[in-house]
């Protein structure tokens, strides 16, 4: 289906009663073709935000990967929100749906993906494990705005974590099967955790 601009569905019923209600950031709701096949959940189940980077060159390729069907259920892997380098935000999956973005934690988390090359295209090559692309100021500013709004909308959230802190599995290196490589390193060493920790009241799961 086509993209349309809207606030994420379901937020009206969980608005904070605080006088200082934060406006919704500008979010383009662009649901994945299989969104309706993802499991439903109550918003109160969400207790953690997980920060990822796409490890892909651009938003178009992130969309292509998100649309890939990988499971018998007719669904694939994606985050809920995607932030481009210029700070624009797209929502691929409604918060009431369980996105497949982090092993073992999907039912109770929401995933935020930042467009960043990461180790692309040598994800599991032991010679290319440095993540060298910085996160632009516009992207981080948009992330902080989104996180502060989500903090107001989802009082059940108590924690924030990087993908690499939750998925610590290793795989054989593509260039040398005798070596083991971390599957996930995102968002990586260039992600400004101190700024994020200062912007929200959630506890940060150790890196």
Predicted regions and their residues:
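Basic/polar, cationic surfaces and motifs that engage anionic cell-wall
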Residues: 18-25, 43, 121-207
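Short, low-complexity, polar/charged sequence segments that are solvent-exposed and flexible
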Residues: 68-73, 100-102, 109-112, 130-134, ...
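Short coil-to-beta-strand
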Residues: 104-122
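N-terminal secretion targeting segments of exported proteins
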Residues: 1-6, 13, 140, 152
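Short, small-residue-rich loop/turn micro-motifs
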Residues: 55, 114-118, 164
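N-terminal catalytic cores of peptidoglycan-degrading enzymes
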Residues: 3, 10-102
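Soluble periplasmic/extracytoplasmic beta-strand elements of cell-envelope proteins
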Residues: 50, 111-113, 161
């Amino acid at each position: 289906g086509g993209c349309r601009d809207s606030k994420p569905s379901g937020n009206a019923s969980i608005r904070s009663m605080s006088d200082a209600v934060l406006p919704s950031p500008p979010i383009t709701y662009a649901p994945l073709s299989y969104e309706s096949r993802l499991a439903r959940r109550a918003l109160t189940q969400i207790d953690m935000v997980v920060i990822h980077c796409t490890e892909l060159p651009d938003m178009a390729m992130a969309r292509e990967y998100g649309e890939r069907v990988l499971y018998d259920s007719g669904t694939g892997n994606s985050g809920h929100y995607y932030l481009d380098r210029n700070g624009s935000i797209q929502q691929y999956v409604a918060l009431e749906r369980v996105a497949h973005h982090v092993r073992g934690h999907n039912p109770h988390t929401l995933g935020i993906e930042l467009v960043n090359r990461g180790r692309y295209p040598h994800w599991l090559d032991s010679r290319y494990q440095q993540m060298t692309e910085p996160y632009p100021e516009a992207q981080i500013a948009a992330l902080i705005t989104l996180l502060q709004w989500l903090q107001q909308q989802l009082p059940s959230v108590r924690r924030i974590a990087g993908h690499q802190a939750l998925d610590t599995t290793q795989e054989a290196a593509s260039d040398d099967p005798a070596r083991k490589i971390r599957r996930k390193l995102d968002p990586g060493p260039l992600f400004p955790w101190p700024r994020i920790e200062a912007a929200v009241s959630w506890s940060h799961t150790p890196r």
